[in-house]
């Protein structure tokens, strides 16, 4: 019995090897990923069915309790019983692809066994679809893994050969011959089939683990390299930056050489051949030009593809990886090797992954840069906005003063020019020192005092050491203008406006107080949050909204405006970060 078991293992080993080789083909990955369709079932049923037919031909033939060994069984006589190994392949198909694939493979094997004939052809043909169907169902019931565990496979593999022996006992015309066959080959067949199924699942699981671990290591390697390259990608492009990048990649990838190019020229070359592969040279390789044009990775497997004019150049092969920015190829990373054998599937996958990650980072940085420019442009637009009514009223005031007080008109005109000049200047800056903001405000207040002499009193309280803190430009003047236009100018008593700038903990608090009419209570929750739908006389809240949006965008949510009414008028308050204000932009 031991000798028979060894013989059966030898025959089954060939089938296991063939089945394992099949699973390494990329098309068979759909079985492991459980992506089963009708087309998949038909295709793989034919493939596994072909292997199961081979399993039938390399089986053994029995006459009674006598075992006949043949290298390849061609036909089976009526007095002979075929004990094939097609059932092993059918069980493998069922475990990998489920009951339908197992059934399909079993039907192919069963139909072929009918043509082989023999005394037990009914049992032999029937066991194959039954084994495939039952193994597939059992595999789905007992395991949700991509590949069943070996222990479960061992358990499931016991039942199909037992069922096979039962069918032979029932369907063989001569019951005595059936008993002799089962006694002779029953136990060895159960042992070999179940262990074969176990060995196959172990082989698949080990191969998958190795592949996934290798992929994880290469992915981690690519991510690590990309992370180290990120600071260089943030810098302005140029030959110096390209050389830094080439040195980094050369160190991390452990290859013969590396070059970085733009669309037409070599920017940097590090490693072997740097004595004749010089920066500034035009792209020579046909494959490099093809990679730039088509945007797909190219591989030079032969030294002739590198097209180097130096006879003894040690660079034999290369991978050319296109780098994208916003969907357009901007250059290449060329990875050079000493031998073509070094360009493995792992190296190609790493090169592709590295190119994709670097391209995504470059595109992300470009998008972030454009977003920042758009944000800055929006801020400039908000900062440069001037209330047209203020200009019209000031021009009207100057026109009126020219008749009665030309000197005062000249003074107001000078203040207006300073105000306008400051307004244009701050449009180019994100943050300005507080003293410049106060100068801008003072120019505005000079004009206001001329318009409302002895009607409005303003005072500003600030410590000298706070004059250098930074503040978004055109913040105080619109707040003061809003207070005067919608509060103080409508008051019957003399208007008083006070600005207090004080340090509190790590912040600078700026508070504007006035004794005007205050804000409508229903508007307080939304002031500064969005523009209002008001008529021209009541205002639309654009000024407060613009200021609040700039404060939030530049300094964060903590610096937003807080607006409330007081017993004597209204109060507008916000804070500036004291220690970090110069590091915001």
UniProtKB/Swiss-Prot annotation:
User: Which positions, given as ranges, span the membrane?
Assistant: 6-28, 41-63, 82-104, 111-133, 153-172, 179-201
Q: Name one GO biological process term.
A: cell wall organization
The cross-references to InterPro entries, in alphabetical order and at most eight, read: Bact_2-comp_sensor_kinase, GAF-like_dom_sf, HATPase_C_sf, Sig_transdc_His_kin_internal, Sig_transdc_His_kinase_LytS_TM
Q: Which residues carry this modification: Phosphohistidine?
A: 389
Q: Which residues form the Histidine kinase domain?
A: 362-580
Its gene?
Answer: lytS
Question: Keywords in UniProt for this one?
Answer: ATP-binding, Cell membrane, Kinase, Membrane, Nucleotide-binding, Phosphoprotein, Transferase, Transmembrane, Transmembrane helix, Two-component regulatory system
* Protein name per the record: Sensor protein LytS
